[in-house]
Design a protein with these regions (language model features):
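Extended beta-strand/beta-hairpin segments
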Residues: 1-60, 68-143
Length: 143
């Protein structure tokens, strides 16, 4: 049973489905909004490297959340971002993540001060719901 939404609660949904394929017990689909994503377990655990795995999705969620907050802070300061690409990496030690490292490469129309960018990254990390929910650090390294 799901908790009813309140002013402080929001509910997010994903559908994960396995079609009963006895040949590939790891293959499944994830439906988010209207998009279906072919997924599997991580390649180290016998999964298909051509498909997304839960570990990658966790890293992508942290990266996307950080990026969206960063872009919002830049917009508020009227800084025009031309492009943003993050080569994020999650580090798994045994059976748990120990950190996620974000390495965003960001191109601006003008050259903002490095101190302002550092402030945006710190604020994005503090504002990101995903990072706030993890029990390990999300670090940012510039590229």
């Amino acid at each position: 049973m799901t908790e009813p939404a309140t002013a402080t609660h929001e509910t997010y949904r994903a559908t994960v489905a396995w079609d009963g394929d006895r040949e590939d017990l790891r293959a499944h689909t994830i439906t988010l909004a209207e998009q279906r994503l072919a997924a599997s377990s991580a390649p180290k655990r016998g999964g298909d490297p051509a498909k997304a795995d839960p570990e990658q999705l966790l890293v992508a969620a942290a990266s996307a959340c950080h990026m969206l907050w960063f872009l919002d802070f830049a917009r508020r300061e009227r800084l025009r971002v031309v492009s943003y690409e993050d080569q994020a990496e999650g580090v798994l030690d045994g059976h748990h993540f120990v950190r996620i490292v974000l390495r965003p490469a960001i191109e601006f129309e003008d050259d903002p001060k490095p101190e302002l960018l550092a402030q945006f990254h710190q604020r994005a990390n503090e504002a990101c719901f995903i990072a706030n929910s993890l029990n390990f650090p999300v670090q940012v390294e510039g590229r």
